[in-house]
Structures are given as structure tokens and as C-alpha cells.
Amino acid sequence: MPQRQPQPAHPVDGIYFGLMSGTSMDGVDGVAVRFEAGRAPVVLAEAFVGFAQSLRDALFALQQPGDNEIDRESLAANALVARYAVCCHELQRTAGLSRDEIRAIGVHGQTVRHRPERGYTRQLNNPALLAELTQVDVIADFRSRDVAAGGHGAPLAPAFHATVFGAPGETRVVCNLGGISNITILPGADGDVRGFDCGPANALIDAWATRHLGKPYDDGGKFAARGTVQASLLGALLDEPYFTAPPPKSTGRDLFNPAWLDARLAAFPQVAPEDVQATLTALTAVSVAREIAQHAPGCKAVFVCGGGARNPVLLDALRHALREAGVPATVDTTAALGVPPQQVEALAFAWLAYRFTARQPGNLATVTGAAGNRVLGALYPR
């Protein structure tokens, strides 16, 4: 007689996978995590699966309008999902899980357009194919529901940050330094959690390193460390109206891309490449620090996640910029709170899948500007 499998204490408790490929477009981060109501999430495995240069080129090309987009987009989505499936299989192998033990996969997809002011955001994905390749339920398309409610569809991580990183009596900021920088302000007392995109981070830093070093990123910030911040160039970059726009706001490669940078560099032909890199690093730090100074002046601690957490030159620049802005905050990575920085974004999308399964809201309207909190995502059954 077959034995009944033990049921979770809460009907949606269990093991979820989270997959995130961000605006740096270098690969996909994945986590396998156990969620139980009233308990901290437990990470069972993590994995990173890189993208081949051919896939990266296809993704970068889709950032800008071009010919035959529908065909190119569909083929790129299938190639992308093939890498997602590899990541899922690696998580399953590392954690020693059968597919029946996995409640669902929460997958963000790859943003190729983000234009909430026009009523849409587009994440490249083929969740039906991922469900077929993994034989696990897939939950995807998290951002569009928030946009449909009048929100920016971003950032979505603040609700997760509040659950995991908040501390009573202490104002904290969680700063994600991915392709784009964003912050979550955790008030530590009565008050709304807030969050928004600050501006470019690795999107421009990596692009400049690729152009001048032939490498996908500035390893440890060494290229920037060879240069000197050019105050006049930094001022010209900071003249971009986005930096002074009030929240809620979100941005991406639609605005902050190499063409945006080149248009401003045209007035500074004498600036050496390493000085441009130093200035781009300062741009990231200053744009974040100014937003913290304006919206969380009492912040005592900033915790960094994302790829920028591995760049000590950028972290030092952020510390300097915060001091200059009059913010007496320490800067550390989320590892100090028990979550390695490379796991945070993927964890957030596993959590969003968990919330969807419980039919609980995943956004914060105070962050995105939506008409209200909404259940985010769509289910693709295995």
C-alpha cells in the first residue's frame, strides 16, 4: 500500500527555486530555498550558470529596436531558457532533490524593455518551455501585474527585503548594485518601506570595461582604481534629469546604455579611459548616496547585494560618497545579515513564487506607485 507523503505545515510551505538574470546579462543566479510560515528561509543550494557570448550578444541587441525582432526575440528566449534549465538541474543535483519535492520555480526572465510610462515591461522568457524541460511548475511574469495597476513594475525586491533584512528600531538601506542600482529603505519603526532605482551601476561600468579591456567586467574595480574621478565629467553625467526625479521611479538600459554615455563623453575627448571608469564608479556611488541622504538621512547601515558587492573600489566609493552627503552609515554586504549578496535577487523571486502560490501580494504599492498591492505572476504548470 503506498504511503502518504508528509504534508507541509502550511499548504504553500516547501521548496522553491528562484532564478534571476539581471541587467548585467552575464548569466543566471539560482537558489533552492525552503520556505516555512513564520521561519526564516533556508537556502539548500545555489548555482550560477553563465551565458555564452553569442547569447549575450543576442540579448544586448534586443535592448534596442531592430529588424526581425519577433523572430530574434523568440529564438533568444529559447536559448535563455535552456540555460535556466541547466541552472535548475544543477540546483536539484546539489540539493539532492527529486522534481516532486520542488513546489515551483520563480523565474524573472531577462528584461529587454522597461517602459512603464507607456504601460508595459518586457522580460524575455519562455516559461512554458522551462516547465517542460524541468517538469516543475513555473511562475513567471511578475512585473506586468504591477504595471497594469499603474505601477512601475520595479523594484519588486523591497517586500522581500523587508521580510528578511528589517530590524526594529534601526533604519537600514539595502542597496542592490546590479546593472542598475536600487535601494530599499527599511524604516525600523512606523512608516512605509520605500524603494526605487537610483541609476546606472554595472551596466555602464561593465560596458566600458568591455570596450577598453575586452573583458566582461572590471574585476575588483582595478581599472577604475588606475584612474582619477573627473569632476567636470561627473557633473555632466549627473545632469541627467532622472537623478533628480522623485520616486516612485524605475529605469534600465533603455536610458542608461553606451549610447547615453557616448553622447556625454563627446564634450570630454581628452579624458583617459581609466579616468572615465573611475568617474562611472563615482557616478554609481554618488547617485546612490544622494538618494539615501534625501530619503533616509537617519540611516545607520547600508547593506549591499548584487555584482557590485564584489567590487571593493565601488564599495569604498560609496562609503566616501555617503560621508560627503552627511550620512553616518556603515557599508557592508548582506553577508553580514546572513545572506550572501549573490543570492539575494534569486531569493527574492523564489519568495515571490511562494507568495503567488499563497495568493498573497508580492509588490508594495508605496514602492512602485501601483494602485494597490497585487498578487504577482502567472502559473505555467508542469
UniProtKB/Swiss-Prot annotation:
Keywords: ATP-binding, Carbohydrate metabolism, Kinase, Nucleotide-binding, Transferase. Pathway: Amino-sugar metabolism; 1,6-anhydro-N-acetylmuramate degradation; Cell wall biogenesis; peptidoglycan recycling. It catalyses: 1,6-anhydro-N-acetyl-beta-muramate + ATP + H2O = N-acetyl-D-muramate 6-phosphate + ADP + H(+). The keyword Transferase applies. Its EC number is 2.7.1.170. It holds the Pfam family AnmK. The keyword ATP-binding applies. It is an enzyme of class 2 (transferase). HAMAP family: AnhMurNAc_kinase. This is Anhydro-N-acetylmuramic acid kinase. It comes from Burkholderia cenocepacia (strain HI2424). The gene is anmK.
